[in-house]
């Protein structure tokens, strides 16, 4: 199917709230990403500020808040019921009360870009706070709250999320059994 037709069908499906996986995404710079899949039940806020690579999977019932700049690298998987946030008003609203409404820049309002590195997995019901920088090859376990920096290849869990392991420890034995995958694995783990 032609990319323009796929894109038009995806827009109609999103507008109608169609509950299915939609294949292909047109980035704000015009690039067509044929292998990126974003479920129709996922809400994308400020898509013009979404910097997303190809080969990304975003499952159902997620919130991708790109209003402050959301960067999702190649091969990222976002499962379901996750929030990738780039702004937060909860402190500002609580502190300012009614004076929050209409204020140009209310105290406590946060807007920061969030980055998710290549081949990272984000488990169900996880939240990435505004300004988070999640490295490459990270495994974010279910129900985690991530804030701040997460190093490459970390396994993180909890609220707040803490490093509990390294994905290379579980990848090594598997790669020993599947040597045909080692070259591709090393290409993305070593690339910058």
Where would I find each of the regions flagged by the language model?
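Terminal amphipathic alpha-helical/low-complexity segments used for targeting or macromolecular assembly
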Residues: 1-35, 75, 82, 88-94, ...
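Short helix N-cap motif at coil->helix boundaries in the Bergerat
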Residues: 148
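Flexible, glycine/small-residue-enriched loop-and-beta-strand segment within the central core
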Residues: 42-52, 57-133, 159-160, 166-168
């Amino acid at each position: 199917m032609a990319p323009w037709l796929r894109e038009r069908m995806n827009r109609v499906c999103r507008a109608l709230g169609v509950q299915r996986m939609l294949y292909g995404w047109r980035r704000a710079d015009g690039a067509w990403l044929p292998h990126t899949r974003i479920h129709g039940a996922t809400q994308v806020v400020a898509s013009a500020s979404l910097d997303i690579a190809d080969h990304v999977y975003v499952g159902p019932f997620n919130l991708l808040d790109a209003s402050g700049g959301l960067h999702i690298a190649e091969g990222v998987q976002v499962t379901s019921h996750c929030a990738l946030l780039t702004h937060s008003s909860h402190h500002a609203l609580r502190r300012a009360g009614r004076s929050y409404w209409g204020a140009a820049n209310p105290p406590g309002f946060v807007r920061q870009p969030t980055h998710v590195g290549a081949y990272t997995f984000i488990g169900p019901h996880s939240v990435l706070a505004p300004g988070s920088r999640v490295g490459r090859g990270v495994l974010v376990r279910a129900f985690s709250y991530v804030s701040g920096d997460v190093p490459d290849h970390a396994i993180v869990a909890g609220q707040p999320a803490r490093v509990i392991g390294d994905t290379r420890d579980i990848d090594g034995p598997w790669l020993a059994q599947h040597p045909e995958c080692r070259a591709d694995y090393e290409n993305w783990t070593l690339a910058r």
